[in-house]
């Protein structure tokens, strides 16, 4: 059964792309970032191909690409465009293929003057993985994001933490958020396919990512 998820985070820079690359490498999934900003500094698609060791054919092209490293709604406006949800549809892939879709920033990042990223998640209908830090402040940030996802009536599949071990923060998130923490991705000294797969096998239960 294929694994298909939408990856969001509590903040920009929290580790969504590395988590997405890890899942693509470990689950042999296709990578897709429908809305990409900051292309002048490179794309997350290129990063995932490089560190996960996957070919271009194992990725789907972005629907919207913008050069400035700013929020999608602003990047589109600066380009004289508007992001339309109706233009963003799941890529056409074989039924048996797994898919990892990565959002731009967090769950409440605006895409246009009306729609937030939660609206895109709802349109795509994929179970959501929330990426969060393990460090101080993560409880508040994670619980706020969990509340936002549930308010939007999205299927929150679980939380993935990134960073050093912090058992107390993990327990607090599971208790107060009533959500599963699926595992923790440590800060890796080297980012390549072998290291990502090893980290996944050491810190996650593969069965938690089935369908």
Where are these regions (language model features)?
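N-terminal phosphate/diphosphate-binding loop that engages ATP/GTP or pyrophosphate donors
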Residues: 4, 18-84, 90-93, 97
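Hydrophobic anchor at the beta1->P-loop junction of P-loop NTPases
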Residues: 7-8
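Conserved glycine(s) of the Walker
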Residues: 14-15
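Short internal beta-strands
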Residues: 33-34, 129-132, 157-163
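Short, structured coil segments at secondary-structure junctions
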Residues: 52, 124, 176-179
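Switch II (G3) loop of P-loop NTPases
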Residues: 87-112
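Inter-motif core of Ras-like GTPase G domains
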Residues: 112-135
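C-terminal lobe/tail of nucleotide-utilizing enzymes
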Residues: 146-211
